[in-house]
Regions:
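A residue-level marker of the well-folded mature domains of exported/periplasmic proteins
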Residues: 3, 20-370
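Bacterial Sec-type N-terminal signal peptides, specifically the leucine/valine-rich hydrophobic h-region
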Residues: 14-18
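Positively charged n-region of N-terminal signal peptides that target proteins for export
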Residues: 1-11
Length: 370
């Protein structure tokens, strides 16, 4: 509103100066006044155009707004659901599909950084970024802030120091996502609720497990790894880590890692924790190939609640998963972008909640995914 008032003031000045031209008795004075008035009028026209854009944003007209979206890797099953829903939501809010550009970072930060620079050069109105590496957030933020473009991070949370920097500088930067500690805790609770009498199949008084991690630099992977086990320990259960490997969120990689772990540790493995469902699907392939049966002589949990994983939970071939609510997250990310375009502020951390998924509610979650 302040911007609109200032533009009206500039316009009034232009009119006054034009009137002054007509009242001058000096040709030189008249010429100079006319030139000044011309410059002022041009400035007013430019400001009025900017104001029109601001008013359109405030009234919900986003048809000419350009949105740049950077996804860390298109082949990630969860991020495919996320980006598809995000695009659809933005279109439903009045953005033109041709003005929404989505780029595949191919799991390479240098590639993604170049894509962000290209979006800046193209003068997009807002950027939504799912970083390849959360540790690169400071560099990304500095690039985008220097260009004066609002920035919404999704799915992969930058560290607390970076988020504090946004707040301290009052930048138009925010993060939309879930607290990965909650997802890890929910994984642990799903296993904990089975009970020690069923979990401790080898009778050593401990929960013997292997951990298949995502990207080791990713904060979500770190928290899920830590808090899934912590949920057991907090209830007095002793744990024994037999193996921990990096699966990089990939199904085929996880299948190979779990196959090797099963060959090495045999029946001693009682629980397989996976940082996401893609890796849990790979783990299940290895478990079945080894002649083991989920729910009978081994337990398996993931995160994301992919459709196939939920079907496996219903069938009893996956113990449980955690719904990474891409619907709420993608809509919240779209709303955050809209707020920035309308000249409004966002909280720097927009939190969404995870949901535990077991056989009791997997059917309900599947219904949401259709």
């Amino acid at each position: 509103m302040k911007k609109i008032l200032s533009v009206l003031t500039v316009s009034a000045m232009a009119v006054s100066m034009l009137a002054a031209c007509g009242n001058s008795g000096s040709t030189a004075t008249t010429t100079k006044a006319a030139e000044d008035a011309k410059e002022t009028t041009a400035a007013a026209d430019k400001a009025m155009a900017e104001t029109k854009a601001a008013v359109e944003a405030m009234s919900g007209d986003f048809s000419d707004k350009k949105v740049g979206i950077c996804i860390y890797q298109f082949s990630d099953n969860f991020m495919t659901l996320f980006r598809t829903e995000l695009e659809s939501y933005l279109v439903s809010k009045g953005f033109k599909k041709e003005n929404i550009k989505v780029m595949d970072g191919a799991n390479d930060q240098a590639t993604q950084t170049n894509q962000i620079q290209n979006f800046i050069t193209d003068k997009v109105d807002v950027l939504i970024v799912n970083p390849v590496n959360s540790s690169s957030a400071a560099t990304i933020t500095d690039m985008v802030q220097a260009a004066g473009i609002p920035l919404v991070y999704i799915n992969r949370e930058p560290d607390q120091d970076e988020e504090k920097r946004w707040e301290d500088n009052k930048w138009n930067v925010c993060y939309v996502g879930c607290d990965a500690r909650q997802s890890g805790t929910f994984q642990g609770e799903i296993i904990r609720d089975i009970g020690m009498d069923k979990l401790d199949m080898n009778g050593n008084g401990k929960v013997d497990y292997i951990m298949i991690k995502g990207d080791p630099e990713n904060i979500d992977a770190q928290y899920r790894t830590e808090y899934s086990v912590k949920a057991l320990q907090d209830k007095g259960m002793e744990v024994n880590k037999l193996d921990e490997q990096v699966g990089n969120w990939d199904q085929a990689t996880a299948q190979s890692l779990v196959a090797n772990a099963l060959a090495k540790n045999g029946k001693d493995i009682e629980v397989v924790f996976c940082n996401n469902d893609s890796m849990a699907l790979g783990a299940l392939q290895a478990i079945q190939a080894a002649g083991r049966t989920v729910g009978k002589d081994i337990y398996l949990v993931g995160v994301d609640a992919l459709s196939e994983a939920c079907q496996n939970v219903l069938a009893g071939t996956q113990t449980g998963t955690v719904f990474n609510d891409f619907l709420t997250q993608s809509h919240s990310a779209g709303d955050a972008a809209i707020n920035y375009l309308a000249g409004k502020e966002n909280e720097h951390y927009i939190k969404c909640d995870y949901v535990k998924v077991t056989a009791e509610n997997a059917k309900d979650i599947l219904a949401l995914l259709k």
